Amino acid sequence: MQLTLWTYEGPPHVGAMRVAAAMKDVHYVLHAPQGDTYADLLFTMIERRESRPPVTYTTFEARDLGGDTAALFQRTAQEAYERFKPKALLVGSSCTAELIQDDPGGLARGLGLPVPVIPLEFSAYQRKENFGASLTFYNLVRAFAKALATPRATRSAARPSCNLLGATALGFRHRDDIREVTLLLDRLGVGVNICAPLGASPDDLARLPEADFNIVLYPEVALEAAEWLKRTHRQPLVKTQPIGVGATHAFIEEVARLAGLDPRPLLGPAESRLEWYSRSVDSTYLTGKRVFIFGDATHAIAAARVASRELGFTVAGLGSYSREFAREMRAAAALYSLNALITDDYLEVEAEIERLQPELVLGTQMERHIAKRLGIPCAVISAPVHVQDFPARHSPQMVFEGANVIFDSWVHPLMMGLEEHLLTMFRGDEEFHDEAAPSHLGVAVATAQATHTPAILAWDAGAERELKSIPFFVRGKARRNTERYAQERGLPLITIETLYDAKAHYSR
């Protein structure tokens, strides 16, 4: 166990809550102490859902540990069923409650409730949130997706159909992605049978085998369930996530091949503005910009591909907190001659960003904080995210409109960086500097200029002025390199010559 102020993933029961909150007619009874009810805030405050997640807590206290906590759980489960009347009841323990080993599954089955009871058993001190979401969805699919009364081959099919799998509550732009993918499939001539878990009920899960194939949009949640559907119901899988123009074309071709359709009408160059925008004049200065990428495996791998192939960036670092997909991450990093950073410690990520000094950071909410501290432009590409990344507007990441959103989200921080650099350049002008009075008020009173004096090395005024002319998003790197150069050579004062000598030294 590790004490930290930030975690990329919560415990497994938070993943189970994400699945339960995404679905209809499902309720989750969680054996947990009072302190574990914090997870409600993730859905009501951050995702801004209009209702609480469908979760009932036993909320036992320390004094209850001397009594019968098993009876408390059974009473809570019975009351939850009578109040909410779900069609499926999930039962499990939080990480803390696992220690008292009350067996919620056995206790709930002993109640004889007239609905399926699905026990969720996690190794809470070894596994995390995405594992919990994946296992919960897998157990639900296994419980309800039984054999069809009529085989698919004998049913009349006016058009092929598919299931969209993996979208959950608290997912990064999942709601908007589903809308875009559904519209694209409709244009291609493919119907959507069921979208799950998001918006699905237990009755909908029973209809999953009716589709001709499954599309795994978010492997962290849906891959295990989709593999089971493939083995049990002979449903092929589409594993390409349509993030970026190239991946969307590959996705269309893969779906069309399974559905027996012609993909060419949807492969035209005018479907997305990203390709032209990335070649346009105001974007040419972006070519070769060094970018550091960190997030869940699905979005991190896709971001690296889009950054390198479609925007002309150089991938300087690539990593993920998704240990279950470490093999895929390492294979993706090898394409850019990198070693993948697989960690859930934000301090390691911060140290890597500081070491690499990229010009753009693509990551989670924590990378946004890190980049802000280091003065580096940043865009969020992956959960976990804060409230601003659950926008009221339509803002997908997938398909052609998602590619447009990606271009705006990633490139605009760099463009604003250039604009701010120009403003900073003119602050040193005798007419436009910060201390200058408005021109109609006459001559401004001269004020003393503060000189930045580090603890060890001093900069003369000329070197400070020259440093300010460097774009702010690489200014920190220039300062550090110059000070390191001066320290190594025992120079007590940094001048303009020192600044340029250091630049030449580190450019070799």
Swiss-Prot record:
Which InterPro entries does the entry link to? ChlB/BchB/BchZ, LI-POR_suB-like_C, Nase/OxRdtase_comp1, P-CP_red_C, Protochl_reductB, Protochlorophyllide_Rdtase
Positions contributing to [4Fe-4S] cluster binding: D36
| Catalytic activity entry | chlorophyllide a + oxidized 2[4Fe-4S]-[ferredoxin] + 2 ADP + 2 phosphate = protochlorophyllide a + reduced 2[4Fe-4S]-[ferredoxin] + 2 ATP + 2 H2O
Q: Which cofactor does it need?
A: [4Fe-4S] cluster
Active site per UniProt = D282
Q: Name one GO biological process term.
A: photosynthesis, dark reaction
EC number from the UniProt entry: 1.3.7.7
Cofactor note as given: Binds 1 [4Fe-4S] cluster per heterodimer. The cluster is bound at the heterodimer interface by residues from both subunits.
User: According to its UniProt record, what is one Pfam family this protein matches?
Assistant: PCP_red
Pathway(s) where this gene product acts: Porphyrin-containing compound metabolism; bacteriochlorophyll biosynthesis (light-independent)
Q: Which UniProt keywords apply?
A: 4Fe-4S, ATP-binding, Bacteriochlorophyll biosynthesis, Chlorophyll biosynthesis, Iron, Iron-sulfur, Metal-binding, Nucleotide-binding, Oxidoreductase, Photosynthesis
**Binding-site residues, substrate:** G417, L418
Q: Which GO terms describe its molecular function?
A: 4 iron, 4 sulfur cluster binding; ATP binding; metal ion binding; oxidoreductase activity, acting on iron-sulfur proteins as donors; oxidoreductase activity, acting on the CH-CH group of donors, iron-sulfur protein as acceptor
Job description of the protein:
Component of the dark-operative protochlorophyllide reductase (DPOR) that uses Mg-ATP and reduced ferredoxin to reduce ring D of protochlorophyllide (Pchlide) to form chlorophyllide a (Chlide). This reaction is light-independent. The NB-protein (BchN-BchB) is the catalytic component of the complex.
Record HAMAP family: ChlB_BchB
Family, per entry? Belongs to the ChlB/BchB/BchZ family.
Share what the entry says about its subunit structure, partners included.
Answer: Protochlorophyllide reductase is composed of three subunits; BchL, BchN and BchB. Forms a heterotetramer of two BchB and two BchN subunits.
Q: What is the protein named?
A: Light-independent protochlorophyllide reductase subunit B
- Its source organism is Methylocella silvestris (strain DSM 15510 / CIP 108128 / LMG 27833 / NCIMB 13906 / BL2)
